[in-house]
Amino acid sequence: MMETEGAKIMNRQWKKYDQLMENCYLGIAGGDSVINEWNDCFDVLIQIIENERESNPDFGRELDLLDDETDYRHDVQGWLEDYLDELDMREMYPRLEAVCRKLLKIFDWKEEYPSEIRFMLASALGSQGKVEEARKYCENWEEQEKDNPLAAAA
């Protein structure tokens, strides 16, 4: 069966993502993780999702289903958790804020609620001195999720 041009492009993008992801982990293993590769990998992932949604608007609507839809070939959810941790560890709070906001926007969050991402966003805001914005964000979050201990802790 002949592969369409769109499928070829998507395969190249996934290969690029996989290579960048591998470089991220090799860097950690070697003790010299390069944050630009982590950032590039995230940007490629977002580009993949947006491109896939052009032909299939339901593609990857939920983060936990993204791995399922790709037959678990790319460990997207696990890599994203590691990326957020890497940004937090490096105290790259403006980028962490931007990444958290993008993740909250790009996925529907109906299957799984993004408590950890919301907590990291609140922390990133506070760490940047955006105390009032962080306070309002946390109050709104707690109002939406009265029984969520992470919302109360934020």
PLM region spans:
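Solenoid-like repeat scaffolds
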Residues: 7-12, 70, 102-111, 139-147
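Amphipathic alpha-helical repeat scaffolds of TPR domains
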Residues: 14-29, 60, 70-89, 112-123
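TPR-repeat structural position
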Residues: 31-38, 93, 131
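Alpha-solenoid helical repeat scaffolds
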Residues: 39, 43-46, 50, 101, ...
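Acidic, Ser/Thr- and Gly/Pro-rich intrinsically disordered linkers and low-complexity segments
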Residues: 50-73
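Boundary/linker segments of alpha-helical solenoid repeat arrays
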Residues: 52-58, 110-114, 145-154
